[in-house]
């Protein structure tokens, strides 16, 4: 069955439940304004200086690549270029690592003043950054420097695939032998909530030509993996899972603690 990307027919479940287009749009815009420009008690986007901004993780009082990339995705979907560029510049200024084993990846957590809390990445941030940047390129066109969105996206994905090859130190974010995303580059197991096969289908169209076959294979591998990693009755996934889909016993061999709802949302998004 062809999905929305092929048919150009995008479902609106709110409309299917009887809400008018005006009601839906009003609620979306009100929610954006609350999160990005509401009162100090409500919003978790904050401007920093003249041209940067960050998304605060309110439970941990830091900024994470996960939240920054989600914020960028919201902005590009809603045509909010100023906020998008502010988030991306903050990310590139404070989170981007230019040396060490994580060179060209992004530190997964920073304090709200930009000080790094970590020297390693979390791959879900990189994949969302890349997709948001590709969308920005297609919506607004490429600019200069770090705002050459498509170039930045391709560079991120190149690192994710090719680290660990001769002359390219470090570890890739996708395991080359099975094309599955890792929990972190240096460990050999996955996180079901990271799997975005619908993103990988688009990476197979937008990424560097040499890597497009890889991304097509990653989409197929990811879909097969989710069938193994999600419980057959509940649909819940473990926090972490080995490459065969079984819960990763060395860490958290449990279902439905933190990230199970991500997996549910992601595989339903892929189906759409």
Protein language model annotation of sequence segments:
Residues 252-260:
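Penicillin-binding protein/beta-lactamase superfamily catalytic region
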Residues 134-233:
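Aromatic- and glycine-enriched pocket-lining scaffold segments that form the walls
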Residues 61-68, 116-141:
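Aromatic-rich carbohydrate-recognition surfaces in CAZymes
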Residues 267-272:
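Conserved small/polar residues in nucleotide/adenosyl-binding loops
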Residues 261-266:
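Ligand-binding pocket segment of bilobal, Venus flytrap-like solute-binding proteins
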Residues 1-66, 77-112, 116, 168-176, ...:
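Low-complexity, Ser/Thr/Pro/Gly-enriched N-terminal "stalk/linker" regions
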């Amino acid at each position: 069955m062809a999905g929305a990307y092929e048919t150009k027919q995008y479902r609106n479940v709110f409309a299917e439940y009887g809400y008018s287009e005006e009601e839906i749009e009003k609620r979306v815009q009100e929610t954006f304004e609350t999160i990005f420009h509401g009162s100090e008690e409500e919003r978790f986007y904050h401007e920093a200086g003249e041209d940067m901004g960050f998304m605060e993780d309110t439970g941990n009082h830091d900024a994470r690549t996960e939240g920054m990339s989600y914020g960028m995705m919201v902005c590009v979907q809603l045509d909010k270029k100023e906020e998008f560029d502010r988030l991306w510049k903050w990310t590139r200024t404070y989170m981007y690592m230019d040396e060490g084993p994580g060179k060209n990846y992004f530190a997964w957590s920073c304090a709200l003043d930009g000080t790094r809390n970590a020297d390693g990445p979390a791959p879900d941030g990189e994949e969302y950054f890349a997709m948001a940047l590709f969308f920005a390129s297609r919506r607004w066109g490429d600019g200069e420097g770090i705002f050459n969105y498509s170039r930045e996206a391709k560079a991120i994905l190149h690192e994710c695939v090719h680290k660990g090859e001769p002359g390219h130190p470090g570890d890739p974010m996708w395991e080359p032998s099975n094309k599955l995303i890792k929990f972190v580059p240096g460990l050999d197991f996955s996180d079901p909530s990271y799997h975005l096969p619908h993103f990988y289908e688009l990476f197979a169209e937008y990424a560097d030509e040499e890597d497009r076959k890889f991304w097509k294979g990653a989409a197929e591998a990811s879909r097969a993996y989710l069938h193994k990693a999600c419980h057959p009755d509940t649909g819940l996934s473990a926090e972490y899972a080995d490459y065969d889909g079984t819960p990763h016993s060395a860490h958290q061999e449990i279902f439905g603690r933190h990230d199970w709802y991500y997996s549910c949302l992601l595989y339903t998004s892929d189906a759409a």
